[in-house]
Every structure is written in C-alpha cells, then in structure tokens.
Amino acid sequence: TLNWEQVIEITPILYDSMDRLKRMKESNRFNISVLTHVNSVPEIVEKVKFIRKYFDDITIIACPKELSKTKMVHAKDAILIDDYSENLREWKAAGGIPVKFSPTKKTTEFLCVDRIDQVLDIL
C-alpha cells in the first residue's frame, strides 16, 4: 500500500506551491480553495494535514477520482489551475477558466504557468 504521508513529504513542488499559494492569498484578488482529486481516504487525510500546516483558513475539497471536478463545485467563471489537461477541458466546457500547471510550460491549448502564483500576472 502507498504511504501518502511519505509521498507528500518528499515532493518538493508541493512545498513551493504552498509558498506561491500564500502569495496569491495575500493579494486578496482571489477566493482560494483547494480542489483535489483523491484515490483514497488515507490520501485526503495526508493532503489535508499537509495543507493545514500552512493554512488554517483555506477550504479543501476532496473530489473522488471517479468524478469530474466540475461535479464538485460550480466552475462557471472560476479559475482552475491543474496539471491534468482533461480536468481543464471539462472545466472550460463548464464555463470555467482553465490554467495549465506545467514545469515545462509546453502547451498551446491553455494559459500555462510553471508557478501557480503566475496567475497574478496573467489574469
């Protein structure tokens, strides 16, 4: 069985994203929530524990992997920053604003960022 605590703790991009998310929150330009696909209860437990180390006032929405993120929240006019293109296509189809997170920034289909706080500069 996968040790989600270990996976989250050894993923440096998550730590950087928390710093970037803090910058976005401090801008007061966005109503920020974390919408995350999960495969299991242990995974969401570890994700929540990790996020709560940095933020006690951000809403965390766990979406079962079998459901579209558009079924969990109202996407219309909302921004989704995601690394998975299919999530972004569904988000756009539901009237949302898709932004691709990609360290390589190789996409022409979506606005693309390699740091989540870059949305402050492009939106």
Show where each model-derived region lies.
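Acidic, Mg2+-coordinating phosphoryl-transfer loop and its flanking beta/alpha structural elements
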Residues: I79-I116
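Glycine-centered loop/turn motif at secondary-structure junctions
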Residues: N28-R29, F55, G95, S102
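A short acidic, amphipathic alpha-helical/loop segment
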Residues: D19-R23, M72-H74, N87-A94
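Substrate-recognition "cap/lid" segment bordering the active-site pocket of phosphatases
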Residues: L35-A78, S85-L88
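Short, acidic loop-to-helix structural element flanking the phosphoryl-transfer center
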Residues: L2-S33, P42-V45
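Structural recognition of alpha->loop->beta junctions
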Residues: F50-A62, E109-L123
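Short coil/turn segments at beta-strand junctions that form active-site/ligand-binding loops
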Residues: N28-N31, A75-A78, G96
